[in-house]
Regions:
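Active-site-proximal substrate-binding groove within the catalytic cores of carbohydrate-active enzymes
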Residues: 34, 38, 46-70, 78-228
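Substrate-binding/active-site clefts of carbohydrate-active enzymes
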Residues: 2-53, 137
């Protein structure tokens, strides 16, 4: 097994001891956008100009304490658009934001840590070893929801050799088994995929599969993935 952690350098929670609104993204009118949607409570967004510092600080501390990582998942960097910041002390364009996010991934790789993030975006392909997933749009909706259009497997096949993409393996209904899409794309399987929140990110109740059966299904997909 490989050992990695789930980490985050965008959601900037006000309850954090290190929170400083001067490092939060500002709009041109000098207001600081934010919300309280996630479990961490009120938050704004950390300006990505600051992210490399915190990545290096935190991972250096982990190493100092004897924690050796094989991989790290920097959440949301690749599934959210680039941020902008109008703070005159650290002005940032969206292009700049992608560069700073890329610097975080590059630093991980320089330390021998496999880099990962939520989905895949074209700007991030040079920096990622694997991702959380890259599902088709309909996989993020309940199984009975009508499909919209025809999915184009850009990252799943065109960039197949560039990024390892774990696939959902849910048997969502008697007529739909996502394992078949994993086989079709020669992708990697997801053995256990628990959503952080109910009914979000494709984490719906479907056909229940035992761990033993899911392990066997994953073995089949893995054997094909190793050949592609």
């Amino acid at each position: 097994y490989k050992f990695g952690i789930h980490d985050q350098y965008r959601d900037y929670y006000h309850a954090a001891p290190s929170y400083d609104e001067n490092y939060a993204c500002r709009l041109p009118d000098r207001t600081i956008p934010g919300h309280s949607y996630w479990a961490g409570g009120p938050q704004s967004y950390l300006c990505a100009t600051q992210a490399p510092f915190y990545v290096k600080r935190n991972f250096a501390e982990l190493k100092k304490n004897g924690i050796r990582l094989d991989g790290a998942y920097l959440d949301v960097f690749t599934c959210n658009e680039g941020d902008e910041c109008a703070n005159p002390e650290h002005v940032m364009t969206r292009r700049d934001c992608y560069t700073y996010r890329g610097n975080c991934f590059s630093w991980l790789l320089s330390q021998g840590i496999l880099s990962s993030s939520e989905e895949v975006s074209d700007w991030a392909v040079p920096y990622l070893v694997f991702c959380h997933y890259a599902p088709y749009d309909f996989m993020l909706r309940p199984a009975e929801t009508p499909k919209k259009g025809i999915p184009v497997p850009l990252f799943n096949l065109v960039y197949h050799d560039c990024v390892i993409e774990p696939w959902m393996m849910d048997h969502v209904s008697k007529d739909e088994d996502y394992m078949l899409y994993a086989l079709l794309a020669g992708g990697a399987p997801y053995l256990v995929r628990d959503g952080a929140y109910p009914n979000t990110d494709g984490a719906f109740d479907g056909e229940k599969i035992s761990l033993e059966e899911m392990t066997e299904r994953c073995r089949v997909v893995t054997e094909l993935h190793e050949k592609t």
